Amino acid sequence: MYQFDRKEYEKRMEWYQDARFGMFIHWGLYSIPARGEWVRSVEEIPEEEYLPFMKEFDARDYNPKQWAKEAKAAGMKYVVLTAKHHDGFCLFDSKYTDYKVTNTPAGRDLIKEYVEALREEGLKVGIYFTLLDWHHPDYPHYGDRIHPMRNHKECGNENRDFSRYTEYLYNQVEEICTNYGQIDIIWFDFSYDDMRGEKWGATKLINMVRSLQPQVIIDNRLEASGEGRGSLYECDPTPYHGDFVSPEQIIPPEGICDKEGNPMVWEACFTMNNNWGYCANDHYYKPASMLIKKLGECVSKGGNMILNVGPDAKGKFPKESSAILAEIGCWMDKNHDSIYGCVPAENIPKPDYGRITRNGNKYYVHIYENTLGPLPLLGFDKDKIVKVRALDDGHEVPISNAWMHSDYPDIAFVDLGPDPVLPDPVDYVLEVEMAE
């Protein structure tokens, strides 16, 4: 029986908090209609109209080795793929359903190939697994808030046995935990209304998961969702507590602490465009420059960032996504020390020009916008500054002695040189080493 132990928990979370940056991948049958992963619910598509997509799912361009290489090149340390999303279709070979990838033209277990590809690149393996299942006959249909058949009285729930569904859920999660070696992250999704906690058989489920995968990290969505924080926040963890909070499509304004004011582990998940699953008409991509800054913001507040890619119907990353990943990777190549293993810079105020992260006695000043005149290092004890260097190439950045800041004798200023345009106009990083 699993019981929360603070020391074991903190040890389990070490690699994850050091990693700071991961990739989410949403891929499934919904990639064929290409109108987002919730298409069946949003458009209330009947089962008989959705099932034919199985005949088209051939995974022709599925190349998890390429996925892994792009994630690694972008500076990501872990990847989470949807083994099953809410439509109930499985990318793995489950013995408990025929609604699976081995019964499509793809004809093979895609999760097996995925985990092998990640391990070859030294990436941590994450599996997303939904708690919902719009395909299963015992999952509530009519009257459920989000089921595709929610408005169809003929799909009533009189003969549905939810205990059969939770047994099915348990069995499939057991397959995931048994058949694919070490799983580093299980990303459950999601609780809503009264569908939370023990409604899912959560204690039994987590006891099984933690017995088979004792070091696995689990999100908080057995008891919460993109909103809500779970029992760790209440300082009274249930057996199925989340290891991290999972804010969705938002970065917390001030990071996240529990009720007693202790920092919590969290991960902001968001999309590159406006959909998780492939959407052919959604070309509203966030620029790489924005996402680089958001990564720095997450780390400066004590969180991780997991950035989504939605492969197309054939399994290929959209060209826009690949270009964004490559651009982020160029920045990470030079500046990863300001991300990996970093934490908030306590007692240092957020500067007007950017963000600050810290690793030990080294502070990383992320400059998004240059200042007029020398750049102030507010909150730094100027007598304890050992040196200041540009992180990208290591050159010395001198402490300024200019006359224009003589009215501020207690504040350290640095001289970035005569050019008002930053060497990196997106996020130019200084490494400030302080005396220990």
Language-model-detected regions and their locations in the chain:
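Mature catalytic domains of secreted/periplasmic carbohydrate-active enzymes
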Residues: 1-436
